[in-house]
Every structure is written in C-alpha cells, then in structure tokens.
Amino acid sequence: MKSTQDIIKEAVGKRGKWQDVYKAIYATIKLNTHRVFRHGNTLVWVKILPDQAAQMFVFTADKAGKAMENLAECLKAILAAGFKQIYFDAPYEDAFEFLEPIGFQVDSAPYQNGYRGVIRGTREV
C-alpha cells in the first residue's frame, strides 16, 4: 500500500504541486472542515457541508478496476459516517457513468462553479 503522500503525488501528477494539495488536505482536517476516507490506494477528501451534506474529491493511485472497487468502499464509509447527501463536480455529464457499475446512482444537473459551468452530481440517501 502506498503512503498518502505517494497517492496524492501520483493523482496530481504534472497538473499541480502535490505538496500544496497535501498541505491543504492536512490543514482542513486539523480545522475539522474536511475528512479523508481511504481504501487501498484511493483517498476521498470530503468537505463537510451543512445539513449532513458533503462535497467529495477523489485521489487514486490504483489501476482503473481496483480504483472503482476502492472508491465503492470509500463511498460506503462516507454514507455510514452519517452524510445524507454527497456532491461532486465534473466537466461533463458522462463522467458520472463510471459510478453506476459500483451501485452509486447520481442525479446530475448543470451548476455554475465560479467562472465556468460544470455538471454537479448528487447522491441523496
């Protein structure tokens, strides 16, 4: 199993400085505004929102099939922790189809996020 730092480093790759991402995750956990769920080499960073809602961000160093298996376990843990609604954003609607095989159905709709529109997927419990 890889270290948390190695997972973030591999997931962030050349798109940014993995150290900055790691520091942000660590700081938000200490502030009690976020949680991290991990299974295998997949991390789900969860922002705690009002009304038992959460926004999730996924980092993985697993191969595709194993990443989906581990993501499914993380999602089960998030729901078991008492979150009633989970949000996550993607640049296009087809991005949510990868969740269907692991039994995680979502509703999606356009959402204005800052200066650009994205699709927001929502899972209600």
Which residues are covered by each model-predicted region?
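A conserved beta-strand-loop-helix scaffold within acyl/acetyltransferase catalytic domains
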Residues: 23-34, 40-52, 107-108
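Short, hydrophobic beta-strand segments that form beta-sheet elements in well-ordered domains
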Residues: 35-38, 87-89
